[in-house]
Structure formats: structure tokens, C-alpha cells
UniProtKB/Swiss-Prot annotation:
It is found in: Cytoplasm. Keywords: Cytoplasm, Endonuclease, Hydrolase, Metal-binding, Nuclease. The gene is pelA. HAMAP family: PelO. Its EC number is 3.1.-.-. NCBIfam families: pelota (TIGR00111). The N-terminal domain has the RNA-binding Sm fold. It harbors the endoribonuclease activity. This is Protein pelota homolog. It comes from Saccharolobus islandicus (strain M.14.25 / Kamchatka #1) (Sulfolobus islandicus). May function in recognizing stalled ribosomes, interact with stem-loop structures in stalled mRNA molecules, and effect endonucleolytic cleavage of the mRNA. May play a role in the release non-functional ribosomes and degradation of damaged mRNAs. Has endoribonuclease activity.
Length: 344
């Protein structure tokens, strides 16, 4: 995402959309009553016929729809302003926002949390592709902020089939991996697996892709369980430290350990977390994305809590529905805090 302009007087942010993650962030930030200015098309009656006419409109937002791993955000609302000749003011309309589009978002007042979220997204550039490989199977995935997208999950030919099968299988994996690298243009590749097959794949990848950094690590299996395992590793933090999905999994693991051994250093529930924040006791808070898509009053209360946490140098981790820890956190009221010190 690029922030092209921010007009403080109008509370208007002009943005250029560059990725799926950008669309997901806007889905979280946009609220009912916000106004957006964007290009769109609409069927307009011209005599006995109708044509889809391109135009720029001002839409008062009712709600947004975002489907994971698509390139589109749907913004539903009422047209507040449009070219006079079309006579469509006051009509319901949906803007389809795609990668490459520009949009202006106007709020009555931008919260510090929402602005910081925009700025953080604008600063974010790194992407990584993860390939888990074993002699008989492999999995290729890419993390987005809204979750992990599985690109490929396949079996390989048995080692007993013919001589040289290891090299052939390594080339098969490397070739498919290279195609995804061309498609997504990541900054780095992480190859992991339980045996030495990953080194064979790495050789092939380095021959095909000369200018991509390849990291190698060990993992117990080339499966989704192995993917969950690798997301908790320090190597992931080093390669993509700004991806909250990896950080969130590690923080949740820490919270569960504390609940078992030092439960006084963890609290959960909105009121309990709010009290801990007021005392300056919160080190890290994890919350599910649903809490920022709730009714205006609850959302406003949560945003105030998040602003207070940031002012007191606490860490905020937003957990999307596709995260492996989402349901675990939801069962704990959806919001949990790791504390700096014990409180009553």
C-alpha cells in the first residue's frame, strides 16, 4: 500500500492498493458511515438500452465484504455524490476495489490505531514462500496477513521406481517452486524438511533462480502440521518479522505456557484486559479480528484500549480467522493479554 496523501483537515487518506493484504486491512479499517471516493461502473439507462458507464462517485459506507485470497474488496453503501446527469444520488451501490486501484477514505476522525495500521501496511514490503519437502511429498505455501495460502500440496514418485529418482523429484519440486516465485515475487524462500532432500531441492532452486535468497531449516514433516511447526520458529521471525501470523502463533504458545505455570501473568476478557491496560501491565495483547468488525460502540471501546496499549509501549497482535490460533483465542473470549507484572 502507498499512502499518496493525508489531508488532516478533511480527515481524508488517499491510498494506492498494491496487494491482497492491503484490501484486508481496508476491510478492517472501514466503518459504517465512512465516505469513500473511487472509480466505479454502473448500469445507466440510455433510452431503451442500458450501458455500464465508468464514473467517480462518493459512497457512504454501509458494510464491506472481503473473501480471503481474492483480489477484490466489495464496499457497499449509498451514493452521496456522482455526476449530476446520471441521477443516481441516494441509490445503493457496490464499489469493487482491486489491486492497482486508488481510493480516498474520509472519516469523521481517524483513530490512532487505524492510522498506525495504515502506516505499518505502507511500510510492509517483504514476502516469503515456504516449501516443505520430503522424499515422498511436498507442500508450498505463502503467508499473507489474512492467513496462510496453500499453493501446492502433492505426492512424489516412490524412491523404488527407478534410478536417479531423488534428483528427478528435486527438479520437479524446484521447477514448480520457481513458477510460484515468478508469480508472487517473494523476497526470500524458506526450504524445510525432515531429511537431506531439502538440500537437493535447494541446489536445483539456486540453479533456476539466481537472485533469490534461500533459507534452509529442518521440520518434522512436509505437511500442514509441519507448516504449523515452522511458523513458530525463529527463522520465520528473522525472514518476515512483520507478519503477525507467525508472531501470533509464538505469542499464543507463550501465553499457554504461562497459563499452565504462572497464570497470574495472563488475563483474558475485555474488562479484565482493559483493567490491566489502565495499570500499564500489558506487554502483549492478542485479539481476534471479529472484535474490530463488531458494533460501533464495542469497536470504539476496543480501539481506545488499543491506543492506550500503544501509548504504554505494549504490543498488539490482530489474529485473523485463517490463523491456526484463531479458534483457540476465540474460546478465551477473543482477547488475551500477556502481562509485565502480576496484578490483582
Amino acid at each position: 500500500m502507498r499512502i499518496l496523501e493525508f489531508d488532516e483537515k478533511r480527515q481524508a487518506a488517499k491510498l494506492h492498493i498494491e496487494s491482497e493484504d492491503d484490501l484486508w486491512i481496508l476491510h478492517l479499517i472501514l466503518e459504517k458511515g465512512d465516505k469513500v471516493v473511487a472509480k466505479t461502473t454502473r448500469d445507466i439507462g440510455l433510452g431503451k438500452e442500458s450501458r455500464r458507464i465508468p464514473m467517480t462517485i462518493v459512497l457512504k459506507v454501509d458494510y464491506t465484504e472481503f473473501q480471503e485470497f481474492t483480489n477484490r474488496l466489495r464496499i457497499h453503501g449509498i451514493i452521496e455524490d456522482a455526476p449530476e446527469r446520471f441521477g443516481i444520488r441516494g441509490a445503493h451501490h457496490t464499489i469493487n476495489l482491486d489491486i492497482g486501484d486508488e481510493i480516498i477514505i474520509i472519516k469523521q476522525q481517524w483513530s490512532k490505531y487505524a492510522l498506525d495500521k495504515l502506516k505499518k501496511q505502507a511500510d510492509k514490503r517483504s514476502k516469503i514462500i515456504i516449501a516443505l519437502v520430503d522424499f515422498d511429498e511436498y507442500l508450498i505455501a505463502i503467508p499473507f496477513e489474512q492467513g496462510i495460502k496453500i499453493l501446492s500440496e502433492k505426492s512424489l514418485r516412490s524412491l523404488n521406481e527407478e534410478e536417479g529418482i531423488i534428483e528427478q523429484n528435486a527438479l520437479e519440486v524446484a521447477t514448480e517452486l520457481a513458477e510460484y516465485v515468478k508469480q508472487y515475487n517473494p523476497d526470500a524462500i524458506l526450504l524445510a524438511g525432515p531429511g537431506f532432500f531439502k538440500e537437493e531441492v535447494a541446489k536445483k532452486v539456486n540453479n533456476i533462480l539466481k537472485n533469490k535468497k534461500v533459507y534452509i531449516d529442518s521440520v518434522s514433516s512436509a505437511t500442514r502440521a509441519g507448516l504449523h511447526e515452522i511458523l513458530k520458529r525463529d527463522i520465520i521471525d528473522k525472514i518476515m518479522s512483520d507478519y503477525e501470523i507467525a508472531i501470533g502463533a509464538k505469542k499464543m504458545e507463550k501465553a499457554m505456557e504461562l497459563l499452565a505455570k504462572q497464570p497470574e501473568l495472563v488475563t483474558y476478557g475485555l474488562e479484565q484486559v482493559k483493567n490491566a491496560v489502565e495499570m500499564g501491565a500489558v506487554e502483549t495483547v492478542l485479539l481476534i479480528e471479529d472484535l474490530l468488525s463488531s458494533n460501533n460502540q464495542e469497536r470504539l471501546a476496543i480501539e481506545r484500549i488499543l491506543e492506550d496499549i500503544e501509548n504504554k509501549r505494549g504490543e498488539i497482535i490482530l489474529v485473523p480467522k485463517e490463523s491456526p490460533i484463531y479458534f483457540e483465542l476465540k474460546n478465551l473470549t477473543g482477547i488475551l493479554a500477556i502481562l509485565r507484572f502480576r496484578i490483582n
